[in-house]
A protein has these predicted regions:
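Generic recognition of short, well-ordered alpha-helical segments
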Residues: 40-41, 101, 138-142, 197-201
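Metal-dependent polysaccharide deacetylase catalytic core of the NodB/CE4 family, i.e.
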Residues: 25-27, 47-160, 180-192
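Boundary/entry segment of secreted carbohydrate-active catalytic domains
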Residues: 12-38
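C-terminal domain-boundary segment and adjacent tail
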Residues: 13-21, 53-59, 63-64, 118, ...
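Active-site metal-binding loops of divalent metal-dependent hydrolases
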Residues: 31-34, 92, 189, 222
Length: 238
């Protein structure tokens, strides 16, 4: 990324914009567990509004349409999503609690998943979504090596467990803009899996609202925004 610089001629001051295009806030839409609904339902809505999402997958379960949890994505579906500009990232090989396994097993969980994602999609994962959002400094040191970062804070974007409504999502987004922050959402299933939606139109309307606010809110993949933020924070202006 090229950092966006703001220049005031009168005062002769230069500053680095908080977000690309000098927007007021940023949003990354992340989706966990490689659920097939992410391809059949979520991606078409994102594509309609030219929005890009980040999808965390578990290589062990790919293509399992009879999974008791929810039918899973296939690799061909992942390749199509990548072609549309979406990010496929590491969510571990088999979705264990990474804080409860030994270092050798942890390395297998991350490296095996990285390898198969690269082999199947042609793109090496540059970010990670931690299973159960569980991590420690020791786990992070292993998992984030060679990556731009990991999701460490998230806004649960679902209904059965997170209890989202149109009003609560609107409040979250307004606060994000007011505070000039980057917000990361976390969604699992739509009709299946965990934290399903009783009213999925609320989610689709949120996507539409993000597209409407494209001049003030930068919506992009987790890795793209994380890379910009890291560069921004590393800049020293003299």
């Amino acid at each position: 990324f090229f950092l966006f610089l703001s220049l005031s001629v009168k005062s002769q001051t230069v500053s680095v914009a908080d977000f690309l295009g000098d927007r007021q806030a940023a949003v990354s839409l992340t989706f966990d567990d490689g659920i097939q609904e992410h391809y059949t339902l979520v991606a078409p809505h994102l594509n309609r509004y030219t929005l890009r999402g980040t999808f965390g997958i578990n290589g062990k379960f790919m293509g399992d349409i009879d999974d008791h949890f929810a039918p899973r994505l296939t690799w061909e579906e992942c390749r199509r999503m990548v072609a549309d500009g979406h990010e496929i990232c590491n969510h571990s090989w088999s979705h264990p609690n990474l804080t409860a396994i030994d270092r050798r097993t942890l390395l297998v969980e991350i490296r095996k998943n990285d390898s198969i994602i690269k082999a199947e999609t042609g793109v090496k994962p540059t970010s990670i979504l931690y299973p159960f959002n569980a991590t420690t400094p020791q786990v992070r040191a292993v998992c984030e090596e060679g990556k731009v970062g990991a999701r460490l804070e998230q806004f649960g974007l679902g209904q059965r467990n997170s209890g989202c409504t149109a009003a609560s999502i609107d409040t979250w987004l307004r606060q994000l803009i007011n505070d000039r922050r980057w917000g990361v959402t976390m969604t699992h299933g739509i009709y299946t899996a965990w934290d399903q939606w009783d009213e999925p139109w609320v989610l689709w309307n949120f996507f539409r609202e993000l597209a409407f606010k494209k001049d003030s809110v930068w919506v992009d993949t987790f890795s793209n925004i994380q890379a910009y933020v890291k560069e921004r924070n590393a800049v020293t202006l003299t």
